[in-house]
C-alpha cells in the first residue's frame, strides 16, 4: 500500500515538472519577443528566470550566444 502511494506521488511530481518545462517552451514559441537572434532569446529566457537557457535557445531553433554558452 505504501509502495503504491509512493509510486503515485513520484509520478505526479514527474508529470508536474515535465508540464512546467513544457509550458515555458510553449510560452517562448508563442511570444514573439523571445527575440530575433539567439542572444535576444537568451536574454529573454534569463529575464523569465528560466534555467538551461542555452538549451532553450537551441530548442527554439536559434544559436545561443557563444560567450554565454559552451
UniProtKB/Swiss-Prot annotation:
Q: Where is the signal peptide?
A: 1-22
Give the superkingdom in one word.
Eukaryota
Broad class of the protein's primary localization: secreted
Listed A to Z, the keywords are: Cleavage on pair of basic residues, Disulfide bond, Neurotoxin, Secreted, Signal, Toxin
Q: Which cysteines are joined by disulfide bonds?
A: 34-41, 45-53, 54-69
Q: Which residues form a coiled coil?
A: none
Which GO MF terms does the UniProt record name? toxin activity
Cleaved propeptide residues? 23-28
Q: In which tissues is it expressed?
A: Expressed by the venom duct.
- Tell me its family: Belongs to the conotoxin K superfamily.
Q: Briefly state the protein's biological role.
A: Neurotoxin that induces excitatory symptoms in mice following intracranial administration. No symptoms are observed after intraperitoneal and intravenous (tail vein) injections.
Per its record, how is this protein called by name? Answer: Conotoxin Im23.3
Amino acid at each position: 500500500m505504501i509502495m503504491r502511494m509512493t509510486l503515485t506521488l513520484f509520478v505526479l511530481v514527474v508529470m508536474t515538472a515535465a508540464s512546467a518545462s513544457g509550458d515555458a517552451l510553449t510560452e517562448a514559441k508563442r511570444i514573439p519577443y523571445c527575440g530575433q537572434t539567439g542572444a535576444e532569446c537568451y536574454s529573454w529566457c534569463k529575464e523569465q528566470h528560466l534555467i538551461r537557457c542555452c538549451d532553450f535557445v537551441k530548442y527554439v531553433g536559434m544559436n545561443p550566444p557563444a560567450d554565454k554558452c559552451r
